[in-house]
């Protein structure tokens, strides 16, 4: 028997997200595999990656009749800062306003469509707040490594594949993709305008940063994982016919960690990214763009982590020989030891 529905498909509503009202729309009412009816809620002006499914009958504190402004006035609630004049704040605190189209690849204008205008943050403001499911991945990862399990590499879903999947969700035309390396930031007084192309550029930049960080002095690797990394570099070099006894040739072999490692190691980098960025000479506008892109990517990872992470199935026990070699590994400087 169907539950009584207080809202209809196509109805404009106010939906509460992280304690604040946003204008939204009921786009559909679906039934899941358990026979539970769900409201499909789309936040107006946001990419569909933010869509939510709220069980019918459990929407009491989430969905309300009317607009966000009407809800705020009636309940004496604060409107989200994205609906007001931008203020200086941590961009990881709440989901950014997203003006992208819902269908990828439909943008036809010559100018990249703007995603959001956000206040400029300084290096001291930087913060990456991983959602609980992503934090749990890192906690479980630490526990498994401490029990002498190692992440299986190459991973089924590499960082390169994850970022490729993410980029596919960002609506840009083929013409715009060909200009992805052009100027992507527009300054408006104290604010910064972020385009869809800027999100793509930032995501690709994070991959490059990941490759440098993981491959430099064993950053992002626990000491127990270092022999695995060295073995993998040598294996890939031998496959290319490179002399592995030549340190210079091995270093220039073109090994890309992003082709081998998956979401766990990428999350390790994101969690420490503010500390890394403070060591750079980039100005506040560049840092601001990066952090907005990071947050948008985290939303994607949180929504899709079940595809890219399988828990303990992504790990394997180490052999006795491997364990002995890990104890003899050099003490390099690493973010995780």
UniProtKB/Swiss-Prot annotation:
This is Mortality factor related protein 1. Protein involved in the remodeling of chromatin thereby regulating various processes including transcription, chromosome synapsis and genome integrity. Mainly binds genomic loci carrying trimethylated histone H3 'Lys-36' (H3K36me3) or 'Lys-4' (H3K4me3), and acetylated histone H3 'Lys-9' (H3K9ac), 'Lys-27' (H3K27ac). During meiosis, required for the presynaptic pairing of homologous chromosomal regions outside of the pairing center and for the progression of chromosome synapsis. Essential maternal factor required in postembryonic germline development and in maintaining germ cell identity. GO terms for cellular component: autosome; chromatin; euchromatin; NuA4 histone acetyltransferase complex; nucleus. It comes from Caenorhabditis elegans. Its main location: nucleus. InterPro entries: Chromo-like_dom_sf, MRG, MRG_C_sf, MRG_dom, MSL3_chromo-like. Pfam families: MRG, MSL3_chromo-like. One of its GO terms (biological process) is heterochromatin formation. Keywords: Chromatin regulator, Chromosome, DNA damage, DNA repair, Meiosis, Nucleus, Transcription, Transcription regulation. Residues 122-327 form the MRG domain. Expressed in oocytes (at protein level). Expressed mainly in germ cells, but also at lower levels in several somatic cell types, including intestinal cells. It is found in: Nucleus; Chromosome. PROSITE patterns: MRG. Residues 75-113 are annotated as: Disordered. Residues 7-55 form the Tudor-knot domain. Component of the SIN3S complex, which contains at least sin-3, hda-1, athp-1 and mrg-1. Interacts with cfp-1, a component of the SET2 complex. Interacts with rfp-1. Disruption phenotype: Maternal-effect lethality and sterility. Primordial germ cells (PGCs) do not proliferate normally and death of germ cells may be as a result of necrosis or increased apoptosis. Increased proportion of oocytes with fragmented chromosomes as a result of irradiation. Tumorous germline phenotype that is suppressed on a rfp-1;glp-1 double mutant background. Germline progression from leptotene/zygotene to pachytene is defective.
């Amino acid at each position: 028997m169907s539950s009584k529905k207080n809202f209809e498909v196509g109805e404009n509503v106010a939906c509460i997200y992280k304690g604040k009202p946003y204008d939204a729309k009921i786009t559909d009412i679906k039934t899941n595999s358990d026979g539970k009816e769900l409201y499909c809620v789309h936040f107006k002006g946001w990419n569909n990656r933010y869509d939510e499914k709220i069980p019918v009958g459990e929407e009491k504190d989430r969905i309300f009749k009317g607009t966000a402004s009407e809800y705020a006035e009636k309940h004496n609630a604060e409107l989200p800062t994205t609906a007001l004049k931008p203020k200086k704040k941590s961009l990881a605190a709440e989901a950014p306003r997203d003006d992208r189209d819902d269908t990828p690849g439909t943008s036809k204008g010559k100018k990249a469509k703007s995603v959001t205008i956000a206040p400029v943050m300084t290096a001291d403001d930087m913060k990456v707040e991983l959602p609980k499911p992503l934090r749990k991945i890192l906690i479980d990862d630490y526990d498994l490594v401490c029990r002498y399990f190692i992440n299986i590499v190459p991973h089924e879903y590499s960082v390169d594949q994850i970022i490729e999947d993410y980029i596919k969700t960002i609506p840009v035309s083929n013409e715009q993709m060909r200009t992805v390396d052009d100027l992507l930031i527009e300054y408006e007084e104290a604010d910064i305008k972020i385009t869809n192309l800027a999100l793509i550029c930032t995501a690709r930049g994070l991959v490059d940063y990941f490759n440098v960080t993981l491959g430099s002095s064993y950053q992002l690797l626990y000491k127990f994982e270092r022999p695995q990394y060295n073995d993998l570099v040598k294996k890939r070099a031998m496959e290319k016919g490179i002399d592995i006894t030549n340190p210079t040739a091995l270093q220039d072999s073109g090994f890309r960690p992003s082709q081998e490692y998956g979401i766990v190691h990428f999350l390790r980098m994101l969690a420490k990214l503010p500390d890394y960025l403070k060591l750079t000479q980039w100005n506040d506008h560049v840092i601001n763009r990066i952090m907005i892109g990071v947050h948008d990517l985290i939303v994607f990872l949180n929504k899709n982590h079940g595809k890219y992470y399988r828990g303990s199935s992504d790990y394997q026990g180490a052999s006795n020989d491997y364990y002995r070699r890990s104890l003899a590994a050099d003490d390099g400087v690493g973010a995780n030891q």
